[in-house]
Amino acid sequence: VKLTSTPKSESNARWINGGKGLAFIMGGQIWTANIRTGKEGWKVTGLTQVSDIPAGISEFKLSPDQSRLIYVSYVKSDVKTPADCYEDLGKANAYTTNDLMYRHWDHTVMEIPHSFIADFSPKAAASVTSETSTDILAGEPANYELPTEPFSGIEQLDWSPDGKFIAYSCRKLTGKKYAFSTNTEIYIYNVENAKATKISTA
């Protein structure tokens, strides 16, 4: 049964409110809606845009009690264009970088995926913002990736049953070490104190 009919694409649908609603991504932001079924079939009402993240959101995962969420967005990489240094060179097509792995397969890495935590309230419009979110990799090199490029996604992170911890895998390397390694490690992130502990030793 088709539930939505909008000009934009919807994805990452998640049941909320005990099956009475859905959370999903539309136009790079998280939206929620009430959902019900009756004689006329399924109906969606009460659309609410919950997030307002300038860089957009590609994926998200709710905590077990649905009071928080993890979402994937992007931070600027170290790769620079001429316009980053000279405003009048906006049409110049070139890049500068001081590190390896500035490309993944078919694209230059202008943005790096990071995962963020925020409180989640289904009907609180624009409540998930950059100011209300915590970067799981805060305090670490900005070019660490979470999820890992180029093919990983939100499946690299998972909530503990009590919602107090997040397990994630990450390749915390830069430069030549990053370029020559595909080895990710597993970390446990404490949501309350924002500290991560590596638990794998491979």
Question: Could you say what each language-model-derived stretch is?
Answer:
Residues 19-22, 69-70, 163-166:
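Hydrophobic beta-strand positions that form the internal "hydrophobic ladder"
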Residues 71-142, 169-172, 176-187:
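Predominantly five- to eight-bladed beta-propeller fold
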Residues 150-160, 168-171:
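Extended surface/linker regions that mediate inter-domain or inter-protein docking
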